[in-house]
Amino acid sequence: MQAINYDIDYDAEANKVGLIIGIPEEIYFCSISKVSTVYVEYINNSWVAWRESYVPNTNQRTSYKLITQGNFELVIARVKSYLTYIKRNKG
């Protein structure tokens, strides 16, 4: 049996779900409201996704929610589901 070797284009996959590239292959983000942002970042050999909310017109964080952590495919799939859920409940 031969090993399958494939490379993931992290930036392209993140763009497909609506994330903006902060630092290529390291951090991505998406604003979901005037006061909330979703982040995806590669930290300590693992991908982590979370949402932060802020006090309007300040940098002071009011809440933090861990969405998921794990390999890139898992995190992107969960972020896609989370963003779909948020968009569905906004409208």
Regions found by a protein language model. Give the residues of each.
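A short, charged, amphipathic alpha-helix used as a generic interaction element across diverse proteins
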Residues: N59-R61, T68-K87
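Short, flexible coil/linker elements and helix-boundary hinge sites characteristic
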Residues: K16-G18, G22, N45, K87-K90
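Negatively charged, low-complexity tracts enriched in Asp/Glu with abundant Ser/Thr
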Residues: M1-K34, T58-R61
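Non-membrane alpha-helical secondary structure
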Residues: Y6-D9, I67-N71
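Short aromatic-glycine-(Arg/Gly/Cys) micro-motifs in beta-strand/loop hairpins
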Residues: K34-Y64
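Short intrinsically disordered terminal tails
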Residues: M1-A3, T84-G91
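Hydrophobic beta-strand residues in large extracellular and virion-surface proteins
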Residues: L19, F29, V38-V40, W47-W50, ...
